[in-house]
Regions:
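Conserved beta-strand-loop-alpha-helix junction that forms the acyl-donor binding cleft
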Residues: 105-121, 137-142
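Solvent-exposed beta-strand sheet faces enriched in polar/charged residues
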Residues: 56, 110-112, 132
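Short aromatic/hydrophobic contact patches that present stacked aromatics
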Residues: 75-77, 110-112, 147
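Conserved active-site alpha-helix within GNAT-family acetyltransferase domains
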Residues: 89, 115-133
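Acetyl-CoA-dependent GNAT
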Residues: 5-75, 79-81, 92, 98, ...
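Short hydrophobic/aromatic beta-strand or adjacent loop that forms the aromatic wall/cage
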Residues: 38, 141-146
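Active-site acidic-Proline motif in GNAT/NAT acetyltransferases
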Residues: 79-85, 115-116
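Extreme N-terminal starter segment of soluble prokaryotic enzymes
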Residues: 1-2
Length: 150
C-alpha cells in the first residue's frame, strides 16, 4: 500500500469510490471541491484508490485545540469495496512518515471523532493517536478529540 497526494487526474476514479454511509464523513468528490488550505491524500493498492482523507491546514484545526503546526484530519474513509482489510489502519500508520517527507512544517495531526463512532475511535487509538480531554460539538453530535504527534 502507498499514500500520495490527490491529483486532478484522479477525479474520475473518485467518481466510482463507493461510500454510502455518510453519517460521519463526506464523500471524496465533495471533499475535493474545496482544497483551499487542504491536502487531499489517497491510499492506493495496485493503483486502486482504497482510502481517502483530507489534511486541513486552515483555521478549523484551532476548534479542536490544534496549534499552528497541526493538521486537522477530515473526511477519512475507506471505499466500501475494500473495508475490513486493514487499509484504514495502514493509511494512518503511513501518514507520519508522509508528513515528515512532504509537509515537514507540521508536527501533529488532530481530529474529531463522533462519540457514536466507536469503530473509528478504536482505529485511531490502535494507530497511535491519543485521546485528548476536550470534546467538541460537531455537526453530527459530540466528538472526541484525538492527536498524533509526528
Amino acid at each position: 500500500m502507498q499514500i500520495r497526494f490527490y491529483r486532478s487526474s484522479d477525479r474520475e476514479a473518485l467518481q466510482s469510490y463507493h461510500l454510502t454511509d455518510l453519517r460521519f464523513t463526506s464523500h471524496p468528490i465533495q471533499a475535493v471541491a474545496d482544497l483551499e488550505n487542504r491536502y487531499a491524500i489517497l491510499g492506493l493498492v495496485e493503483h486502486q484508490i482504497v482510502t481517502f482523507l483530507i489534511l486541513d491546514a486552515g483555521e478549523k484545526k484551532f476548534t479542536y485545540g490544534g496549534q499552528p503546526e497541526s493538521l486537522l484530519l477530515r473526511s477519512f474513509s475507506t471505499d466500501e469495496d475494500f473495508q475490513m482489510r486493514g487499509y484504514g489502519s495502514q493509511t494512518l500508520k503511513l501518514l507520519p512518515d508522509f508528513i515528515r517527507e512532504y509537509l515537514p512544517m507540521y508536527k501533529s495531526i488532530i481530529l474529531g471523532v463522533n462519540e457514536r463512532n466507536q469503530v473509528a475511535s478504536y482505529l485511531y487509538r490502535e494507530t497511535g493517536f491519543s485521546k485528548q480531554p476536550q470534546r467538541i460539538l460537531g455537526p453530527a453530535g459530540w466528538q472526541e478529540v484525538y492527536e498524533l504527534k509526528i
